[in-house]
């Protein structure tokens, strides 16, 4: 399983997503409330998935995506308006309100992509 980092500005959002993932068998490596924390956590891991909101007190999701290690994929969970205005390639998005099964299926798809990439190396 991939390393998972969860980053949202509200701690309760982070905890709710962590609970959903833990109950579904995923291991969450770090929970963060700022972009800087998310990047530091990702840089300490070899690879994985960053599940992120769109706005933090210190940066926007585009900046986080730009500085994210290449071995990491990013899953943006945001309002439909935020997702429509995005101009970032290689970014997986889920619109709010989000259903639990959508999150789990998306993570499964992203993990499959990471696994395929590792096999090619």
Where are these regions (language model features)?
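Active-site charged/polar residues at nucleotide-handling catalytic sites that mediate phosphoryl
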Residues: 44-45
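Conserved acidic carboxylate
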Residues: 7-8
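Two-component/phosphorelay signaling modules centered on CheY-like receiver
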Residues: 11-30
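C-terminal output helix
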Residues: 98-111
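The C-terminal output helix
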Residues: 108-121
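Conserved phosphotransfer microenvironments
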Residues: 14, 35-38, 48-69, 79-82
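Alpha4 helix (beta4-alpha4-beta5 surface) of REC/receiver domains from two-component response regulators
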Residues: 63, 78-95, 105
């Amino acid at each position: 399983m991939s390393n998972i980092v969860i980053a949202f500005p509200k701690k309760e959002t982070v905890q709710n997503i962590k609970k959903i993932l833990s109950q579904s068998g995923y291991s969450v490596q770090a929970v963060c409330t700022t972009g800087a924390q998310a990047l530091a956590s990702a840089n300490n891991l070899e690879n994985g998935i960053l599940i992120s909101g769109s706005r933090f007190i210190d940066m926007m999701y585009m900046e986080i995506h730009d500085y994210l290690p290449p071995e990491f994929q990013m899953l943006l969970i945001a309002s439909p308006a935020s997702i429509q205005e995005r101009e970032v390639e290689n970014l997986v998005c889920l619109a709010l309100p989000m259903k639990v099964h959508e999150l789990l299926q998306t993570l499964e798809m992203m993990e499959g992509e990471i696994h395929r990439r590792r096999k090619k190396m």
